[in-house]
Every structure is written in C-alpha cells, then in structure tokens.
From Swiss-Prot:
Listed name of the protein: Ribonuclease VapC3
The keyword Hydrolase is assigned to this record: yes
Protein family: Belongs to the PINc/VapC protein family.
Keywords from the named record: Hydrolase, Magnesium, Metal-binding, Nuclease, Toxin-antitoxin system
CC cofactor: Mg(2+)
Known role: Toxic component of a type II toxin-antitoxin (TA) system. An RNase. Its cognate antitoxin is VapB3.
Ligand binding (Mg(2+)): 6
EC assignment: 3.1.-.-
Annotated coiled-coil segments of the chain: none
Gene: vapC3
GO molecular function: metal ion binding; RNA nuclease activity
Signal peptide start-end: none
Amino acid sequence: MDAVIDTSVIIEIFRGNKDTLYQICDYNCKITSITVFELYCGNLKENEMIMIDSLPKLNFDDKSSKIAGNIFKKLKKEGKIPSVKDLLIASIFY
C-alpha cells in the first residue's frame, strides 16, 4: 500500500524515532516536492539527503497550483487562512 509521508514524519525518523519508522515500514512511502523543499531548508546530513533523494516524489504541477488557488479562495471567503505549505501539499492529492 502507498503512503505519503510528511516533513514531521521524516524528521522523527532522522531523530531516531523507531516507533515512527515501524509505523511506516510496511508502506511504499512517497514524499511531495514541497516536503523536499521544507527538508532542504534545514541542515541535512549527507545520509539524510541520500534518503530523501531516494524516495519517490509527487510533484506540485499546474493542476495542483490551480487546485491550491481555488481551495485558498474558498477558505478565505470562510474567514480561514490555511498554511500555504500544507495547502500546496494537500492540492497534490486532490
């Protein structure tokens, strides 16, 4: 089964959290291009970069950008302003 893992999950794995690793070990894990950006903003070790680069990626594309824009407008009308990074990640799966 496929699973998309978020930045916080990867950071927990990098910190040595074995419980987190065991929870995802039976899945075919993927990350988004937005998650790659978030991780590369930090101070990654070489082995962490290799792990990130080895995971399959789901990319933010033209379709995702339109979806994100429409979701943002809808939420803004409702008085809610979402986290832009979370909105971009969510739009990849919509």
